[in-house]
Amino acid sequence: MVKSEINNNGGEPVFAVLTQYLKDFSFENPSAPRSLRPREKAPQIDININVNANPIGDDNYDVVLSLSVKANDNNETLFHVELIYGGVFHIKDIPQEHIMPLVFIECPRLLFPFARQIISDATQNGGFPPLWIDPIDFAALFQKRVAEEQKNSQTQPS
């Protein structure tokens, strides 16, 4: 393959993390200290994940990973964690068709271990065992997002 076919401008492809940041964080332990007693079974853990991205300036993207984690035992909320963790990525000289997968798959994949650690530390500091969230398939989330966008564009009147 000729190098000019790999990228648009003839420059070397660039993918770099410029910064990472904690945008918003909340840990609620509404039933403490009652919620900290030993339990016979593991609580129900509900995890919601969302990825958003916006271009900011030339070749830079702000990618935000939002996580909401709730632990419930019967009707009692044990804890609720909300985290918005972001990063600014510099993406240059990469073919246009690869930008969105890079932004919505690879960028959150790089952010996730840091967000996971924050949630683990918060649950442990809240008096619970550390919660280690399983790895997330960001490719599947991206495919689902694309399918929903296509479905919505087909159902909207012209």
UniProtKB/Swiss-Prot annotation:
Q: Which domain of life does the protein's organism represent?
A: Bacteria
The protein's location, in the record's own words, is: Cytoplasm
Q: Which Pfam families match?
A: SecB
Q: Which UniProt keywords apply?
A: Chaperone, Cytoplasm, Protein transport, Translocation, Transport
Gene3D superfamilies on file: SecB-like
Q: Of which family is this protein a member?
A: Belongs to the SecB family.
Q: What is this protein called?
A: Protein-export protein SecB
Gene source species: Bartonella quintana (strain Toulouse)
Gene name of the record: secB
